[in-house]
Amino acid sequence: MIKVAEELRIDPWGTSYIKDYNRLMREFGIKPITKELLEELPSVHRLLRRRVIFGHRDLERIIEAIKTDSEYVVMTGIKPSGPFHLGSKLTAEEFIYFLNLFPKAFGYYAIADLEAYADNKIPLEESYKIAIDNLADLLALGLDPKRVYVYRQSEEMRVLRLAFIFSRGVTYNTLEAIYGDKPFGLYFSALVQAGDILAPQLPENGGPKPTIVPVGADQDPHIRLTRDLAQRFHSDFGFILPAATYHLLLRDLTGQEKMSKRNPMGILYLCEDLKLAKKKVFNAFTGGRATAREQRELGGEPDKCVIFRELLTVHFVEDDRKLKELYQECRAGNILCGECKARAWEIISEWLRRHREKKEKTRDLAAQLLQEHTLT
């Protein structure tokens, strides 16, 4: 765990808190996503336009691959510990975006069942079932099963072999300095994740190539460890340092700094019962004033509001002009929070219904994909 005073706490397995993202970027060498960089991309996702994805390491490598008509890899995964929620959706959308950005991109998707066991004590048999459900969500979000290789960490010998090799390149003190005092199983799972990220560059997978890993800011310790290992073992494998993009850590529905299963009212699952989902949305933290009169006179505070920031901006309103209208209406005091929640619920519930319909059609395909790794 990286901890710099109480304003910056980064723990990929625990609670992270980032008050100042500029400080995070200075401390650890993350570059900002600039307007000039966005202009180099063939298309720009709303998460980039709205600065939800705020930083990167070596995104230029991916842009160069596109310009030179070269292949690159998009790598991500999921710890199969429960159903897809909004946080899972965020990373999944980034994965699909970078995959669809260029025809020669190919995806690798790790089912992190070893991490689920090390961190959550979830048996491999149980995580297998959860993984199928997670993959059904991923397919419903638009993943092309012909352009991805899906695997379970526990069964992917190339990844496990790399993790063992990498263990010669780090010491216990190094891992403790990066992650803090953790059970050794979590340290090993970090080496396995490094194997996940670098395995696409092995000779049997086509050799060294640019790789991009979209992550939340709290996962940067894994990226830094992996990039360090890529350098240490460059003479053995010819690894190209993996690129990464970073998205903001979003609050839960109640306004807490990070979603936690210990606060179930703060998490919105994609398969949520609609009655419960509605209750969560209507109880979400807002930027409303103390009274309706104050709201009309002073205007609302959408920059503080979970409904506007975390739900509409990040997830459910694609059109930038529509989003701007909603923002201005709130700031002008022309709408009260109850009305805004009702309108937001119409948008969210429609999305959830459509997603559920798509997901039901992908369950068999998800099981097949996990069994066969890719589809032709």
Question: Model-derived features: where do they sit?
Answer:
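Non-catalytic terminal extensions that flank enzyme cores
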Residues: 1-78, 227-282, 288-291, 306-376
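N-terminal Rossmann-like or analogous alpha/beta NTP/dinucleotide-binding catalytic cores
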Residues: 1-73, 80-199, 357, 375
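Structured ligand/cofactor/substrate-binding pocket environments in proteins
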Residues: 84-90, 96, 113, 122-127, ...
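Hydrophobic/aromatic-lined pockets within catalytic cores
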Residues: 100-103, 139, 143, 168, ...
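Short helix-capping/linker segments at secondary-structure and domain boundaries
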Residues: 104, 199-211, 315-325
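Residues on a specific face of well-ordered alpha-helices
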Residues: 132, 136, 224-228, 279
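Short amphipathic alpha-helical segments and their helix-coil junctions
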Residues: 146-147, 166, 170-179, 281-297, ...
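Short, solvent-exposed polar/charged micro-motifs at secondary-structure junctions
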Residues: 158-164, 225, 254-257
